[in-house]
Amino acid sequence: MTTELDPRLLSLLVCPVTKGPLTYDRETQELISPRAKLAFPIRDGIPIMLPEEARQIDA
């Protein structure tokens, strides 16, 4: 099940590692930090912003 992330919430959140902006990947239900090359999961509509919960990405 995919849920939409409120754009207002996305505008408030930053990467906990770089403090940079995040993008929302609807398909994978993750918040992407291009600078840190991390993908933070969204579980039950709640972004999990812990670096140890993120996965490395190649982007």
UniProtKB/Swiss-Prot annotation:
One of its GO terms (cellular component) is cytosol. InterPro entries: Trm112-like. Belongs to the UPF0434 family. PANTHER family: PROTEIN PREY, MITOCHONDRIAL (PTHR33505:SF4), ZGC:162634 (PTHR33505). This is UPF0434 protein GOX0764. It comes from Gluconobacter oxydans (strain 621H).
